[in-house]
Amino acid sequence: MIYMRVAIIGMGTAGVSVLRQLVKHENFSQLKVDVYDDDRNMGQGVPFQNDSSELLINMPSKSMSLNLDDDQEFWKWYQNQTEFNFSNPQYLPRFVFGHYMKSYLSYYNDQFDNLTIINDKVQEIFTQSDVDDTDLKYHVCTCDDEKEWREYDYLFLTFGTFSYHDPYDLKGTKGYIQTPYPTYHTLDNVKDSD
């Protein structure tokens, strides 16, 4: 059997959504799928990582879903899980939605032998092809060792928002906060006298 090799780089909301669509395809068993993200964000993404329970999703829980066929799937998942219990679940913390997404990635990883989770940072992506060649192969590099580079037929770039642009070169300046996530560490280095 000839396998088509697929990479999904970035496993937050978009990456998990792409994987959910791929596994529904009748030929999914003929794919070899590698998914890339760091261990902290794998399956959750930055905005939905473990963080303060004060950060609520700005949509009612019953209206959230990654499933196009069931717009209450997140709510149903929340009702059936036992890890989280909030007294007013109409608006749940963002990290709970992250756990919902991560639960599907874990489920797919347990169900499918043709899915591989790779917790290495992607350092480079390149193609090698001749002019006018439409049969591209994508190379994903997570280290300098060429033997470790992986080749793919298709590539999904789902890494979300890049880090904030710093037009005033403030990064590294005392008091400047580059990113608010995770919020429970955002103010660690800010003193009352700042």
Predicted regions and their residues:
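A structured beta-alpha segment of the ubiquitous adenosine-cofactor-binding alpha/beta core
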Residues: 115, 122-123, 142-148
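Extended hydrophobic secondary-structure segments that form protein cores and membrane-embedded regions
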Residues: 7-8, 32-40, 116-121, 156-157
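Glycine-rich dinucleotide-binding loop and its adjacent helix/turn
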Residues: 159-194
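Glycine-rich active-site loop/strand segments that organize a redox cofactor
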Residues: 36-99
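A conserved short coil-to-beta-strand element within the FAD-binding core of flavoproteins
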Residues: 118-136
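Short hydrophobic core segments
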Residues: 9, 122, 149-163, 194
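N-terminal Rossmann-like FAD-binding beta1-loop-alpha1 element of flavoenzymes
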Residues: 4-34, 194
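Helical element adjacent to the flavin cofactor pocket in flavoenzyme catalytic cores
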Residues: 98-117
